Amino acid sequence: MVYLAILLALAHTVGRSAAGAVDSFDYIIVGAGTSGLVVANRLSEDPSVTVAVIEPGTDQRDNINVTSTTAFGNSFGTAIDWAYSTTKQHEAGNKELPLHAGKAWGGTSTINGMTYIRGNVAEFDAWERLGNPGWNWAALLPYFKKSERYHIPTESQLAAGATFESRYHGFDGPLHVGYIPALENGSYAPLVIDTWEGLSVAHNPDLNSGSVRGFGMGPQTLDTGSNVRWDAARAYYHPVEQRSNLRILKGTVKRITWAKGKGKKGTLVANGVEVLNEKGKSTTLAAKTEVVVSAGALRTPLVLEASGIGNPRILKSLGVETQISLPGVGENLVEQPSHFLSFSANLPIAWSAYHAYVTASDIFGANTSAVEAETRANIPRYARAAAEASGAGSVNARAVEKLLQVQHELIFKHNATVAEILISIYGGGFSNYWTLFPFSRGSVHLKSLDHINEPMVDPRIFLADFDLFTLTAAGKFTKRFWFSEPMKTQASVTGPVGLPHNATDEQWHANLRDTVSANSHPIGTAAMMARDLGGVVDKELKVYGTANVRVVDASVIPMQVSGHLTAALYGVAERAADIIKGAAH
């Protein structure tokens, strides 16, 4: 009876009584975030399959800070933001930096900036080189389209700067993508166009074409008719919440449980999960087919480590018996350092943002060849620094070196964009810029079994000085935008605070170290890569050494992309659902 009472306390489903709760499901999905709800929707299309999603957050469909298309940032620090902090960042003023992640049905798609931009072709193609045959742009494009319901811009939105090429978009998917109705004033567009083109940054007619270099107005995940944010819950769960075979259960997964017998080739077989309710009481739910971990890049490693999967040295310190030695768990964390310039502008409200994606040659100019050579020469040093920072047995420096070499080729051979500059006009506003491909590598690990909601996150911001140099160059290039005609007659730049107008590189470096922020775009902590490179999951997204545990979230993305993670995640999750369904037949 006690067991049943705990289980019933965990259950929460819309329109159904908790009395109908069951303790056994074909699939258990850990996390009702951006990726988890995509997988849940697609798996439950088969009425003979039962799917449970375990999520500590709640339904936020009526939260104005979520539904509003102009309330970005209002949810930060509230009950639906995990509001993590990094460890002290030794190369960034020894400060702890905030990291935002959604704690709600829909995960971070409920609190992010809604930007829908995928990335460059070469970046997705690089995944194949890391031990993932079949993972490339061509394979993912159909899934991007499958998820998308693109809204063609109105004539006034086109006049205000919205552009698109229909062949790159889907029009029948569950995820609404478009431009906010408030984007109706076109007087801002010519200023941006003329200024960027004066700096040799061309207009990009569609930032979702697989080539993001240039500038353009990025679409967002919203319904243009109702002017409402279209997060993963609204797109993938609300329309199907009455399915009798799909349930969201409130609780926090502490660990995966294992069957006594082994699977093929001696693999571990998951038979369920241990779940904690809000009072810390636990129960075990049974999984008959698979466990899919979709807790996000900062939480998925914690679930794996608590389950005995990870670096034996770390597991021993936690008092956890090693089930599978996978030192890559929690490593390869890649987070983007970010900064901003504030300004006042004599401009009408535009209520949208222009994204400029710039290459190394754009921001380094005549020094690009020297930067390329210096960066290539520094790769072994960057790799050793990452290995030493993680401690013995966590990271193989040679493996990190290979990853950084692939990244170097993307930037300097394939002309991948190295920085994003975001120009937002809200009467006044800000210009935000960040390094897209940091060479720094960090980690996230479980603090203790008693603190499963408090990850130790160490992105090691600026561990590789390339990241600092690139952010400096991006900041200086952003200032050039505001001080170039015709924009300079319309705006007055007021930042960075404490930095003189003609600041030296050294002054920029000092300022950035003291004022940098984390972009809350973490990836890579359960990377889809060859095991000898530090990979955690294979090309089928299955955790190495397990028979039936997969990971589907940002932690599997092995290398940053030039877009915004949400777009990439919808495509990855759609494909993952097909992989899982295919394995069952």
Curated annotation (Swiss-Prot):
The active site is at H521 (proton donor), H564 (proton acceptor). One of its GO terms (molecular function) is oxidoreductase activity, acting on CH-OH group of donors. FAD binds at A104. Its EC number is 1.-.-.-. InterPro entries: FAD/NAD-bd_sf, Glucose_Oxidase_domain_2, GMC_OxRdtase, GMC_OxRdtase_N, GMC_OxRtase_C. Binds 1 FAD per subunit. Its cofactor is FAD. Keywords: FAD, Flavoprotein, Lipid-binding, Oxidoreductase. Glucose oxidase-like protein; part of the gene cluster that mediates the biosynthesis of the enfumafungin-type antibiotic fuscoatroside. Four enzymes are sufficient to produce fuscoatroside: the terpene cyclase-glycosyl transferase fusion protein fsoAthe cytochrome P450 monoxygenases fsoD and fsoE, and the acetyltransferase fsoF; the cytochrome P450 monooxygenase fsoB and the glucose oxidase-like protein fsoC do not seem to play a role in biosynthesis of fuscoatroside. Glucose oxidase; part of the gene cluster that mediates the biosynthesis of the enfumafungin-type antibiotic, fuscoatroside. Monomer. This is Glucose oxidase-like protein fsoC. It comes from Humicola fuscoatra. The lineage of its organism: Eukaryota, Fungi, Dikarya, Ascomycota, Pezizomycotina.
